[in-house]
Curated annotation (Swiss-Prot):
A molecular-function term among this protein's GO annotations: peptide deformylase activity
Presence of keyword Protein biosynthesis: yes
Any single GO BP term: co-translational protein modification
Function of the molecule: Removes the formyl group from the N-terminal Met of newly synthesized proteins. Requires at least a dipeptide for an efficient rate of reaction. N-terminal L-methionine is a prerequisite for activity but the enzyme has broad specificity at other positions.
Source lineage: Bacteria, Bacillati, Actinomycetota, Actinomycetes, Micrococcales
Species of origin: Tropheryma whipplei (strain Twist) (Whipple's bacillus)
Keyword Repeat in record: no
Encoding gene, per UniProt annotation: def
Designated name of the protein: Peptide deformylase
Residues that bind Fe cation: 141, 183, 187
UniProt feature, compositional bias: Polar residues: 8-18, 123-133
EC numbers: 3.5.1.88
Length: 228
């Protein structure tokens, strides 16, 4: 998920995330080194197919380092395995909320999302969900770079996963962190956030794909090394 956080008039969701939940969020990975990898763009097959569970943790430390290095260089707040061509159920995230850093890796995650959030929004549903704002918060995606679209998400979710040490954890997230978890979890299901947009944005999405010659395998971009 791209780092560009944009609001349209207001943000109605609370970003409360308790210290107790933070302790359950899994061990914060020790991040040093790591290679910056190509980020694949919509059209690459791995982005549009469900990822497979991680069964071998022996090389996971290096994968995690590379994913963090790539995410920070992008820059982004989340990155899933399929985005770097790895069809495994793993994502990393790093999001600062006030003075609190939410950072970790989720391996073989499950995400509990309250009922009532549509798989794809209709224009009417979006209008009904936006009575206190002009439109829902916008999202961006490193696999659909340079664009942001409004998308309604569940205001709270529960993530259960394993960290890089194969230790299980559960975290209850609200607000923007909940949005990040939903966005990255979607990647593991073979879904991009643009697949969920209201129909009225489908023309813009198609035009973006045409203009950039996306929608075919092998398209990618490589983030630049961050300057010291």
């Amino acid at each position: 998920m791209s780092q560009d956080r944009r609001y349209t008039g207001c943000n109605t969701h609370s970003n409360t995330h308790s210290a107790q939940d933070r302790e359950k969020e899994g061990a914060v990975p020790k991040i040093s080194g790591g290679k910056i990898l190509p980020i694949y763009i919509t059209g690459h097959a791995v982005l549009h197919a469900p990822a497979k569970p991680v069964t071998d943790f022996s090389g996971i430390q290096e994968i995690v380092r590379d994913m963090f290095a790539t995410m920070f260089a992008a820059p982004g707040v989340g990155l899933a395995g399929p985005q770097i061509g790895l069809g495994l159920r793993i994502f990393v995230y790093s999001y600062t909320e006030g003075d609190t850093l939410h950072q970790g890796v989720a391996i073989n995650p499950d995400l509990l999302i309250p009922k009532g959030v549509p798989k794809r929004q209709t224009n009417k549903q979006q209008a009904n969900n936006s009575t206190s704002c002009d439109e829902p918060d916008r999202e961006g995606c490193l696999s659909f770079p340079g664009y942001q679209f409004p998308l309604e998400r569940a205001p709270q979710v529960t993530l259960s996963a394993f960290d890089e040490n194969k230790k299980p954890f559960t975290v209850h997230a609200t607000g923007w962190l909940a949005r990040i978890f939903q966005h990255e979890f979607d990647h593991l299901q073979g879904t991009l956030y643009v697949d969920r947009l209201a129909q009225k944005y489908s023309g813009e999405v198609r035009q973006a794909v045409l203009n950039n010659k996306w929608g075919i395998p092998g398209k990618y971009w490589v983030p630049q090394e961050p300057k010291e």
